[in-house]
């Protein structure tokens, strides 16, 4: 499977390692300061990370502030809507403590 890992902290870096060990392809975005394992593709945009991905992986909690991706290891701030807009309808989304507003946006885009 191809996973797009967007935002998060050291837990997402560990998840990246585990997924790569299991033979999956991994693309990361908004994790510029994370120590990611070799084999992880670092992407310049959410759209690049999500292109052709099978599943979107988000952090826990998904958003630190209303509407913003929880991405303490990123060099900038990112709108959660930017991530959802780049995902294909029907794509599974995994994340923790998803706020009702974020869930509504994802469902409105046809994400599951």
Language-model features: locations:
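Short, well-ordered alpha-helix to beta-strand connector turns
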Residues: 23, 52-54, 90
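Structural motif
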Residues: 4, 57-59, 94
